[in-house]
Every structure is written in structure tokens, then in C-alpha cells.
Amino acid sequence: MATRKARNPLAFMPWPVTILTTAMYLALIIPLLVIHHNVPPAPRTSPNGLNLTEAWQDLQSLTKGFHPYNSHQNDEVRSWLLERIDAIKQSTPSTEEYRDAKEEKPDVFVFDDLVSNLTFIDKSVGVYFEGTNILVYIRGSEDNKQNWWETPGRAPVGKGGVLVNAHYDSVSTGYGATDDGVGVVTCLQLVKYFLTPGHAPRRGLVVLFNNGEEDYLNGARVYSQHPMARFAHTFLNLEGAGAGGRATLFRSSDTEVTQAYAKSEHPFGSVLSANGFEKGLISSQTDYVVLEGILGLRGLDVAFFEPRARYHTDQDDARHTSIDSLWHMLSTAVATTEELVSDTTDRFDGHIRDDGTVPSGSGTRAVWFDLFGSAFAVFRLHTLFALSVTLLIVAPLTLLVTSVILSRADKMYLFRSSVYSEINDDYIPLRGLRGFFRFPFLISIPTGVTVGLAYMVTKVNPFIAHSSSYAVWSMMISAWIFLAWFVSRVANSARPSAFHRVYTWTWMFVLTWSLMVVCTVYEHEEGLAGGYFIFFYFAGTFLATWISYLELFALPTKSEYVGRLAESRRPSTQGSRLAASGDEHQDDAAEEDPTESTSLLHGRHRPTFANYVRVGVDRASQDEEEEEEDPNVYEHEQGWSGVLPRWTWLLQLLITAPVILMLIVPLALLTTSALSQTGQDGSPQLLIYLFISCLTALLFAPMLPFIHRYTYHLPIFLLFVFIGTMIYNLVAFPFADSNRLKLFFLQEVDLDNGISTASLTGMPPFVSDVTYGLPSAAGQNESCDWTFRGKRKLQRCSWSAPLPHVVPDGDSLSVSSEDADSLLDATELSPDWISFSISHPQRDSSSVRFEVSGQNTRNCRINMDGNSITNFSVIGSSAPDHRFLNPSPDGLNRIQLWSRTWDNKWTVDVDFSKHDSSETDEVDESSITGRITCLWSDNNRVGLIPALDEVRQFSPAWVAVTKFSDGLIEGSRAFEIKRSSLGALGS
């Protein structure tokens, strides 16, 4: 007769367990990988109100050249944008067509802002910026019909509107296709869409094309000075921190505004990324921090996030993105904006605030994440907190009550090694404690080894994740699964136990309960929702554990089992005693007739230790043989285990693995893409490898209750995978043409002595190898030191470089991009690149007046050798805005000056402190020293910056060059001010 386990194809047996668990993991991981790396296709026919072909052509026009704020190409992009906006406005359908759609034709206003300026202080840096933003306002059907902005100081009337923001400047080394060209053309299409009959907004829509985001978020800051900045209450910021792929929801301000994003056809993102920004794990910032943090709007930050290696390089172009990526951001923006402008409730309106922020009301902190890139879950953090607290209490109580019921039913075999038998007047072994101490080794050994691998890779080949992150994942996963299987098989061979599964689930329950406590505390104290997946992880683990406890009700009572076992042993025991008695009689008879060979000792006084051991072993062996008479018992497991259900393991797998994989795999992929290529920026590489090792344990821990049933085929295969990937990860070169290493370029020209020094900054030893492989640097003494770019410590290697051609000879002060070739004839260094003067506007004052001008630029600086500036003002600037004043108590050491016109002369009044807080006894306190620096960023002609051209031409194919600072060229002249010449300071 066939046994129960033989008849059941889903039984807890090696082949079903191996095949089904492997199939389930692959069936979920593979689609998630495909979704992560493949963008949903754009429709063949553009939806009503949109034109994808036109949008793609606009992107190509926008990205013809590098167009940073301080470039002539930027002016051309601005002119082109105004033309495109005007063309869209002129093509607006007639009033009759709107009537057919039962709508009123909306009013459209275009603001070409060449007036707004802003002076702000951020710690030790002061900035004066003149904006060149473009705003398009589409009046909503429920907006006030008056042009309230035409009256100075007048506040908007009625409900707040919606702002969509993108910046049209790029960095000086990137074409800006995704940073932020796609965002810009999306904004153009939004203007077109909401001017199409059937889509007229109910709330007013402001579309902002800001200029200057790449430098201190200047464009968004100066937008605050425009009257329309008081109108919008919600916003959608479109950005690019990668160079293609999907656009992810980086962060959001609250639940209510995030619900608008949930209307997107292909939502993508997790609240974990928002927590990364909040805790400073992601250092780069977007206009979101200005719009939400300073102006008080409530909104969303949507951006491209990979591949990071193309970000701010010449591969951020139309060639390396796609119309599918464009459609992903455009469709998201349309759905989100349409939901926001259609909202007529008061949830985005509040009372006027004293701090100058807009009265946008207050929202609730949110939890949000996508599911397979097609659905989006969003709910309040308070809801997650309430559910977490409830589950933390209910789950252990449920297991406790179940355990009590099992004990009263006399079926609590757990934690019992034996039970007393009145029949035999002895303890009968249950072996119910077997397998209890297995889990700590089962989890710690594989995880400890993968953590060790993380440290080893960081030591030997730290940047391999830059181009081969999946090789790292393969190494970690294969090592973890093989070791988990090996440890479980060794343990199960030595002490087979039917309780391996229930004990493993119990340990996992305790572990996830502890993690849940930590996450719940952070939810309440810090407002962090990134641990939402732990809630679902714990919930699944609890249910799986409870199922294992409920299985115990299928067991016979312990007394019944012991009684049956005792009865089965009674005859054999009596027979043994009779046999033993007969042996004794025979021995006695033999002793009565001693012979010459008889021992001198009497037989009954012989040592009996050997006999005792043999009898004990025979009894234990006999117990096991009697227990194993049940054909449903697996191998050498406990005899009572034959009645346990054989299919519940699959239910446990279905409850835990799918949910865990659906939530954690996207997080793993998202974070891997975001972090794997940040090491080139100076981020600690160990972080990504530790992240992968820990995520591996979380992803595959649901296998542990079943892994001792695996056949050897898959683990042995994974062992070979581990060996191969480990060797590859240790010896392979970490960079490739498609995953280049970014080096940061800067050329500094001392206009006082004509010294021109170029430098490349990046990670050692690659930066020095590249630098001194250049023709102009060959033969020069290596000059490398350490510097900081932001908070990241990097190596900088310098060499004497040919002069740039950024300023024309003769009397010409500026050139357009069409005439930029004339700069190539400028071969002589002229101190007239920068002109400045220093005077005292008031005799008895600590103020000094600087007049600064640079040729063919609109960006200069006043750099101090110490933090000696207490205040400054630019003549002709607007009144200071207290929202943007955040000075350091030590004072300022730099003033950044930006002008919307070329060759501008800034007049700056600077107040100095009596004593420089950074000065030491070795510094001459009788004078104030510094440098006037101007910057040049125009890089659209070969030959303008020979050193940069040389880097691009002669660097290896796996190297990309990007800007180190605001400008590619910094020309400077020194100045000195005698403190005795300052009236107040000299008195």
C-alpha cells in the first residue's frame, strides 16, 4: 500500500520542496527584474491633447549643446522656449470648441521674468542671483478672474493653484536630456494638454521653467520673489538624477498629495527613498527642498534615477534615453497634475502663516510603494503605526493562547525532550527539543559569511558594483543559500527533527517581532515609514508560525503516545528479562564446574560497564526502531511525526515568500541602482555591499524552514556559481564604456602671474593614472592631494595646462555662441579677464565696496581667506527675504554673484568683523585678504578649453568627465585690505 507521503505530490519531501520554492522565487524575481529594467512602451498614437512626436523633437532641439546658466547656449534655449510657448498659445482652439466640450476657454498668461532677484545666505556662503525664469499661468475655471498680480503686494484670492516645475539649464558637461530636458518638454506638453478642450483645469495651473537649478537651486529660490509664488499650494517637481529608465517618485510631502500620484498608469517608487533624503543618506538635492521646505508648498518630487554613471556627463543626451522614458514621465505628470487641478476640496488650503509660507494647510505623513510598476499603495503613517502596535500585541498573544490550549490538550510536544510513563515507571524520550538551537547557526553563519564577503570585496576591488552589481548579488545569494543548506543538512543528519520547521518559524517570529518594535518606534518618534515592509514581513512570519503551532493539534496526546509506545515495548522487555534470567542460570551452572581455563574471579562479579552501555544503546535503538514503524515518518525523525500534515509547508511558503519578494525585491533593485555608482562621488563603497548582504538574508530567510529538505542539486550548482562570481568580483576591472568612471574637471588661472593649473578629481588610483597619462601632463611631477567635494573626500591631481580661450582679445567684451569661434584666436592671457575696485562708501564704517566685473561671463565670486564677512548687499537688489537667510555664526567666507546679463558690473557693500574667527597667531591680523574669481562654463566649441578637450580625447573609454564646481574655468586675482583703512575697525 502506498504511503501518504508517496501519494501527495505537494508533500514536505525533497523534490516538491526544491522545485516549488525555486519556481516561486524565480516566478516573482524575474518579472520584477524585467519591470525594473524595462520602461513601459509609449503608445503608437498620442492621446488627446498630447503629441509625443513633437515632444521628442523638442527634446532633440533642447539638447543640441551644453546649456548651463553661464553660457550663451542657455540664452538660445530660453529664446527657443519662449517661441515654443507662444506657438502653443497661438494654436489654442477657438471658443466654440471649448463650448462643445462644455468648458470655458481658459485665460493664458506668460511671464517672461527678467526682474526678480534674490539675495540669500546659506551658512558660510552668500549668494546674489538674478533670475530668468519663464512662467505660464493657465487660469482655472474656479480661479478669481481678476489679475491680482498686477497690484503690488496684493495676495491671491480664492483657492490655491498647482505648480509644475522643471529647470531648463544643464550642467556644463552634460546635454541635459534627462536632467532636465524631459521635464522641460513634459511641461511644454502640459501647457498644450490643459489648453485642449476637455482638459481645462478647475484650479489654476502654473508651469515654471526655471533657470539656475544646477547652481544652488537658484532658479527655484528666485521664483519665490515672483507674485505667482504666492498662488500655488501644491506642486509637482520634475527632475533627473540619472539618465533614462523609469521616473521614480523620490519623495512627497504628505498622504493627500501622494494620492494624486497614485492615479498614474505606471507608478514607481517607495517611501524608503524619501526617508533616505530626510536622513541625509542621499546628499544631492532638487528644487523640492525649496518649494516644500522654504515656500511651504505640498507636493511631489519625480525624477529619473539611473544609471548614475551618465548623470552630468555627455551621455545624458537624447541618444541614451528613449521616447518610452519620456512617455513614462509625461504620462505620470499628466495624471498627477490632472488630479490636482481637478480637486475642489479645501484640503490644500489653510490659514495664513506668519512665517511667510503659503497657506497650503497641513497633510498627514504617508506610506507609499508601487506593486509591479502598475499599482500604487498609499496610506497614512498613522494607520501603519496603529496596525503595527496591534500586531505586536495580538501576534504573541495568539501564539501564547495556542500554546496553552495545546498544553491543556496534552499535545504540546515543543520544548519537551521526554515524558514520564506510569506504565514503565520511567521517562520515555519524545525528542521534541531537537532542532531548537539550530536557527542561530542557520542564520548567523550564511549572513556572517556574506558580510565578510562585503568587507573582502571592499578591500580588494571596491568599485566592482559600479558595473557588475548583479555579479555581486549572485555571489552573495549563492553563498548564502549554499551555506544555509549545508548547515541545515549537517544539523539534520546529526539530529533529525520533524520540528525543524516550527522551531525555525518560532525563531523568525521572535527576530521579526524585534525588528517590528524598532520600526514602530521610528514610525512614532521620527516619522519614518521606510520600514513598512517589516510589517508585512512580520505579519507573514506570524501566520506561518501560527500554522506550525496549529499543526500540533494533529498529534496524539502525549499520554496516548507514551501508552502506545509502552505497550509495544512491554512484551519485548519481559522477554529480555527472561532471557537474561536464563543466562544467569546457565552462568551459575557453568560456574559449578570450573576448569583449568576458568577465571579466578567469580562470573557474577565481573565488571558490567560494557554490558550497561550495550543495553542502553540497544534500548535507544529499539525505541527508534519502534518509532519508525510508521511509514509516514520521514527518515529518522520522531515516530510521532508521521501524523503531522504534509501540505501546510506550502501554505506557509505562499503566505510569506510572495509578499516579501514583491516588497523587498523592488527596494533592493531601486537602492542598488541608486547606490552602486555613487562610490565615484566619494560615498563609502562598503555601504552598498553591506546592504546587499543584509538584503540577501531578508529575501531568502523564508527558505530556512524548508531548506533542510532541499536536494543537493541546486545548492551544489550555487556553490559553483559562488566560486565563479567571487573570482570575477575580485579580479574584474570595475569600469566599462557603458558604466564609466566620473572624474571632475576644473582649471584655475591665476591672473596675477599667468599660472594655469588644471586638475582632475576622483577616486584613487584611477585619477592619477588618467591624469599623468595625458600628453600635456606627461613628464610633470605628480601633484596629488586630498580635497572635499561637498562632504566627500576625493583625490585631486593637478598639472600645468594650456590657457583656455574663454575671453576674446581686444575690446570685445562678449560673444554669442554663433561667434564663439573667434575666441580661439585669443591666445594671450590678459588681466582684463577680471576688473575690480575696492573703496569705502562711508568714512567711519566697517563696510567696503567691491565693484567686480568679468569678461564674457555672468558669474563671479568674492572669496575670503577666512570667515570675516558679517553681512553684504548688492546695489540694485531687492529687499532681503528672511526665509532665505541662514547665516553661519562664524560669518561668511564667499559671496557668489550671478547676473542675467553678460559682462555685468556688480557693486557689493561688504561688512567685515573686527577679528577673523579663523585667524591664528601666525596670520597677520592687520589685513584682510582674498581673491576675486570669475567663472566660465561655456564648452560648446572644441578648442575653447584645450585641457578639457585633451582629457576627453586621451582618457580611456571607461572615463567620463564632469564639472567639479560651478564653472569649468576659474580665473582669479588677489586683493588685500588693510584693517587700519576701515574707519570703525581702525578706531
Swiss-Prot record:
The keyword Ribosomal protein does not apply. Residues 36-384, 457-466, 523-526, 671-686, 737-987 are vacuolar. GO terms for biological process: proteolysis. It is a multi-pass membrane protein. Zn(2+) 1 binds at H167, D179, E239. Gene3D superfamilies: Zn peptidases. The chain crosses the membrane at residues 15-35, 385-405, 436-456, 467-487, 502-522, 527-547, 650-670, 687-707, 716-736. Zn(2+) 2 binds at D179, E214, H312. Keywords: Glycoprotein, Hydrolase, Membrane, Metal-binding, Metalloprotease, Protease, Transmembrane, Transmembrane helix, Vacuole, Zinc. The record marks Y311 as: Transition state stabilizer. Its cofactor is Zn(2+). The active site is at E213 (proton acceptor). Pfam families: Peptidase_M28, PFF1_C, PFF1_TM. It is an enzyme of class 3 (hydrolase). Glycans are attached at N51, N117, N781, N871. It comes from the Eukaryota. Its EC number is 3.4.-.-. Its main location: membrane. Residues 572-600 are annotated as: Disordered. One of its GO terms (molecular function) is metalloexopeptidase activity. Binds 2 Zn(2+) ions per subunit. Residues 1-14, 406-435, 488-501, 548-649, 708-715 are cytoplasmic. Belongs to the peptidase M28 family. May be involved in vacuolar sorting and osmoregulation. This is Vacuolar membrane protease.
